[in-house]
Design a protein with these regions (language model features):
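Helix-loop "lid/cap" segments that line or gate small-molecule binding pockets
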Residues: 95-98, 107-117
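Helix-turn-helix
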Residues: 14, 18-56, 60
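Hydrophobic alpha-helical connector segments
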Residues: 60, 74-105, 153-156
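Short, structured helix-loop boundary elements
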Residues: 12-13, 33, 55, 59, ...
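N-terminal intrinsically disordered/low-complexity leader segments
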Residues: 1-10, 193-198
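Short, basic, alpha-helical segments at the C-terminal edge of helix-turn-helix-like DNA-binding modules
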Residues: 63-69
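Hydrophobic/aromatic-rich alpha-helical bundle segments in the mid-to-C-terminal region
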Residues: 119-128, 132, 141-198
Length: 198
């Protein structure tokens, strides 16, 4: 069967997308080439027509999930003034929907404990993604009137990711929701956003 000119690129993108979901949901150690290719409806041997190695796939999938996170960030904050954008992003990031859907959530929360066991290229791609998000948060924080944009952004991102990670680990949904709500309110109060109405 002859495929169209775009078939290889479409298949490649599909593999990266599937790998990104598995990466966030189960971690890099549980992403196997055989299972990925089967999920894509392809043969195991076809993998190497798209990637040099599993590590190359992992790096590309990680870059893709950070790009997806950036698109989500943009979609929920587009057109809002900085204070409102920051408040909106905190609300979305620290919502039960984010906690309950790790395969589509922030890669920082899903992967931070995995990094020490990953390749240098993977860790570098993670660093790049984190720095881009920190830059966006710092920009909003500065535009909202703070003089400590970068330091505050680092602290806020760490608190948000930590709260979501802990809330995912708690099996008691009521307690998990309380933790998320308290952390969200605390972070917004710290940023002077408690009164921002969206």
């Amino acid at each position: 069967m002859r495929y169209g000119d775009t078939h290889k690129a479409e298949t490649h993108a599909k593999l990266v997308r599937l790998a990104g979901r598995v990466l966030r949901e189960k971690g890099p150690q549980n992403l196997t080439v055989a299972a990925l290719m089967q999920a894509a409806g392809l043969t195991h041997g076809g993998f190497y027509a798209h990637f040099k190695s599993k590590d190359a796939l992992l790096v590309e999938a990680l870059e893709s999930v950070f790009e997806e996170s950036g698109q989500t960030l943009h979609s929920v904050t587009d057109g809002l003034p900085p204070r409102h954008a920051l408040a909106r992003y905190i609300d979305v990031y620290m919502a039960p929907a984010h906690r309950d859907n790790p395969s589509a959530g922030c890669p920082i929360v899903a992967l931070n404990s995995e990094l020490p066991r990953q390749s240098r290229k993977f860790r570098t791609a993670f660093d790049v993604g984190v720095k881009l998000l920190l830059g966006k948060l710092a920009g909003w924080i500065k535009a909202a009137g703070s003089t400590e944009g970068e330091a505050l952004a680092a602290s806020v991102l760490s608190a948000m990711a930590g709260a979501v990670a802990v809330s995912r680990a708690i099996s008691d949904k009521r307690l998990s929701n309380e933790l998320l709500g308290a952390a969200r309110a605390s972070i917004k109060a710290r940023l002077g956003l408690s009164e921002v109405v969206l």
